[in-house]
Amino acid sequence: MIVCIAEKPSVARDIADVLGAKTKKDGYIEGNGYQVTWTFGHLCTLKEPHEYTPSWKAWSLSSLPMIPPRFGIKLISDPGIEKQFRIIEGLMQNADEIINCGDAGQEGELIQRWVMQKAGAHCPVKRLWISSLTEEAIREGFSKLKDQKEFQPLYEAGLSRAIGDWVLGMNATRLYTLKYGQNRQILSIGRVQTPTLALIVKRQQEIENFTPQQYWVLATLYRETTFSAIIRKSDEELAQEESDAKENPKKAKKAEGNRGIPPITDLATGQALMERIKNVPFTVTEVAKKQGTEAPPRLFDLTSLQVECNKKFAYSADETLKLIQSLYEKKVTTYPRVDTTFLSDDIYPKCSNILAGLTPYTVFTAPLAGQKLIKSKKVFDNSKVTDHHAIIPTGQSPVNLTEMEKRVFDLVARRFIAVFYPDCKFATTTVIGEADSIEFKATGKQILDPGWRVIFAKPQTNLPEGMTDPDAEARESDEEHSLPAFVKGESGPHLPKLDEKWTQPPRPYTEATLLRAMETAGKLVDNDELRDALKENGIGRPSTRAAIIETLFKRHYIRKERKNLIATPTGIELVGLIREELLKSAELTGIWEKKLREIEKKSYDATTFLNELKQMVSEIVHSVLSDNTNRRVTTIEETATKTATTATVKQPKKKAGTSRKNASSATPAPTIPSDNELVGKSCPLCGKGTIIKGKTAYGCSEWKNGCTYRKPF
């Protein structure tokens, strides 16, 4: 008998249908020589500290660092999990072959490997590796099963990540809680969570410390066209351009003379310039026309989809992940937890059928039918695809979708259709003029051939039912603005003006901009190619970033004001307490992330990684224990009191349907509970669930989602 193990019951049912297994049993489906069973996500987890050494049960500075000589796994304590595991164990003990049908990624590999290890599986194991759950994809996957040994590096990377997070999280959280916490409040520290919080705190401090500088902009109106004075670049701007050119030569700006007037920093200078030119004719000195092309926007990876949904619909990263996961399980989009925007060459022959299946978008797909589809290197590139390709539709018609799912599917579908359309062709016109040797510039843009832009063009009279127009706002900012026909040498009267301006502080992070910052380890990058290069050193993985942001909300380290993410006093104080750069540096944490990726690629040793992490934790413990100051972090209760006091000055009216993030500030922060007050309290480990009472121990209501909190009676 061949045993197939999937990550959830719904996927198991899809696989069983394809394999012809029809007989439903307790915990599995049988038939045609197969037994298809399932997990509920994580069934196993790493052991708790006290399960290695009993003295580690109590939180004590003297027991730190806690580093077991050998890590072990255990079954999560829950009757439902225990029952399902016994079923899996029985099936595997009698199996001739096992097919690992877990989620095709690092976490999915770890989940199933732990279950097989715990069950004592000893027969050959194959791996099903698919990017969608359609019948066609499952059949193709079973025709190309791989040996599980090929995925050993993937497992080692996942195991290293889990152990690394355990070592750092368990030790640093206890260390900072006991050293700097008050009133039993837990100060949660994490390998990804803390640097992410530090990014938000740093941005907030930059805003608070920002001093606005007044300046003036000189412009003039000539033939109903506004020309702005050309401002000479500062040495800092020139140095930044040079640095950017070295990092990304393809996008280097063409070298030009540093022309123009110095920035106008006082009113008198500006008024003098106005007086100087107001009675002098304006003369056109240069008219330059240039044609260019604009490629379609890239296909989505998970992060870019989360960014787009946050910008357009204000969906949180977590909401978007759940929506695209649901679309994947409904078989209308491909595997979502990906970090590439490219497709492999083997997808190209399938694209015509996928387009044909997008029946709500016939108005856009009909012009492509029967034609040879464009195959751009910006879309199809095997070297940019590893485990999975970009998120695309499967070709199955999107039916029975919620309104939120329709919006997300619409984004994915339009991006996919657009990559097979021609580039947008446009012409830009740059006009330079001068008055008394002061140069002014105006630019215009004209769309010659919209190409792929018709997919997003307005008015959207052919929107699929229930679909919105996701790019209306973006299109308005991209609207073409033509200039009148200017001729070099022409001259005439003009009307100068002087506008007062102030320099602006950095903007607070939103979930969209924070996701981008996590992706590039804190570097502000707008260019796709440079962003790709920095992804290797990003903070966290695409599939975990949403959970990290949610954790910061649950820990009361950040809150949301409209779309802006604001650090709470507790979050600010915690980051201020941490002197160890390895704990809060986005760049250094990105290097750790890169090493985990290299383990997956077999170019870095997992043992070396863990030894380095253990050494780092030991150094952090020594450093914190050597701190002789009496610093403490303000408790949530104190923070709430202070906020309430200051908030009485001016309270804006709350709108109906206030964001859950704002409402969540009323929930208690995690604390170190005593045994007699555990049940119903917030889980001290994940902060999401509440403590429940089992047969032999207390646990967390979020155990199905991976929380491993357990406290024996």
Q: Which residues are covered by each model-predicted region?
A:
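Conserved short loop/turn motifs at secondary-structure junctions
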Residues: M1, I99-A104, N183-I186, K289-R298, ...
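C-terminal or mid-to-C-terminal helical accessory/interaction module adjacent to the motor/catalytic core
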Residues: G80, I87, Q93, E135-Y222, ...
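C-terminal helical "lid" subdomain and adjoining coupling/linker elements of P-loop NTPases
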Residues: K179-S188, I200-T265, K312
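Intrinsically disordered, low-complexity regulatory segments
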Residues: M1-W166, M170, I261-I264, Q271, ...
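Phosphate-interacting basic helix/loop segments used at nucleotide- and nucleic-acid interfaces
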Residues: F71-I98, L199-I200, E308-C309, L411-I417, ...
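Basic, low-complexity terminal or inter-domain segments flanking catalytic cores
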Residues: I2-V3, I81, K118, T173, ...
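Metal- or metallocofactor-binding catalytic centers and their adjacent structured scaffolds
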Residues: E247-R298, Q306
